């Protein structure tokens, strides 16, 4: 979008970065799933309410003993009201590793919003596979069935979640690929290499060459 509005500028994206602790707990000892995100951000409120009202009822008969953890600062009243024995509104957690080390998967049922979603690359960095909407993965270079599962309609989302929850082969593939993709795109090393390239003499010289009668200007766009 920025490039379309500013065709004579060289716009490069330096994404948000995450630590990559990886996973040392196998599929067999994991259970439950989570959503993580701050609730000052309206898309997160909508996503949780959408999941709880439209998707969660489709899961109860298949995953009766599983719990859904909602993690995030300042959950509003409508989110807090979702709490039951199996829906845990955990609020702000200073240390999220115990959750990521125990759950089988993470959900990102976002229906609007923009930018690289930290909830997704953070989950993948812990080796926790994600089920997400197509909106949630925009701009993240993730492939359905390889790095993540993508579904938009409630029935399809529920079906993908159940399959991932029950299939060790699928879970292991997405867990391993997710760690690899996060390391390649969202690690400190990936950001360092991108910045080294952008400020290299070779790249800066290329910006001096005119294109269609105008000179390029380097613009860095950071995502969060």
Language-model segment annotations:
Residues 119-122, 129-133, 149:
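Short hydrophobic beta-strand element within catalytic cores of glycosyltransferases
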Residues 92, 98-115, 126-129:
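Acidic donor-binding loop of glycosyltransferase active sites
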Residues 148-155, 163-168:
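Conserved acidic donor-binding segment of nucleotide-sugar-dependent glycosyltransferases
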Residues 170-224:
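C-terminal amphipathic helix plus adjacent low-complexity
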Residues 4-8, 12-102:
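Conserved catalytic-core segment of nucleotide-activated headgroup transferases in glycan assembly
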Residues 45, 97, 117, 145, ...:
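Glycine-rich phosphate-binding loop at the start of an alpha helix
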Residues 134-145, 149-150:
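Short acidic/histidine- and often glycine-rich active-site loop of Leloir-type glycosyltransferases
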Residues 18, 40-43, 115, 149, ...:
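Glycosyltransferase donor-binding loop in the core domain
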């Amino acid at each position: 979008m920025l490039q379309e509005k500013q065709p004579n500028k060289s716009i490069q994206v330096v994404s948000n970065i995450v630590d990559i602790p990886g996973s040392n707990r196998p599929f067999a000892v994991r259970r439950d799933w989570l959503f993580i995100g701050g609730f000052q951000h309206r898309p997160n409120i909508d996503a949780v309410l959408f999941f709880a009202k439209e998707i969660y009822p489709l899961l109860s008969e298949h995953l009766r003993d599983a719990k859904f953890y909602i993690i995030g600062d300042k959950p509003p009243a409508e989110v807090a009201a979702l709490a039951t024995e199996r829906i845990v509104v955990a609020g702000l957690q200073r240390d999220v590793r115990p959750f990521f080390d125990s759950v089988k998967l993470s959900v990102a049922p976002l229906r609007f919003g923009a930018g690289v979603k930290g909830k997704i690359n953070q989950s993948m960095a812990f080796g926790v596979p994600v089920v997400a909407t197509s909106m949630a993965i925009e701009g993240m270079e993730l492939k359905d069935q390889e790095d993540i599962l993508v579904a938009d309609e409630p029935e399809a989302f529920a079906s993908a979640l159940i399959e991932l929850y029950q299939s060790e082969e699928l879970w292991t593939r997405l867990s391993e690929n997710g760690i690899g993709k996060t390391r390649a795109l969202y690690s400190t090393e990936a950001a360092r290499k991108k910045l080294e390239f952008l400020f290299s003499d070779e790249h800066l010289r290329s910006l001096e060459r005119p294109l269609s009668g105008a000179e390029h200007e380097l613009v860095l766009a950071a995502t969060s």
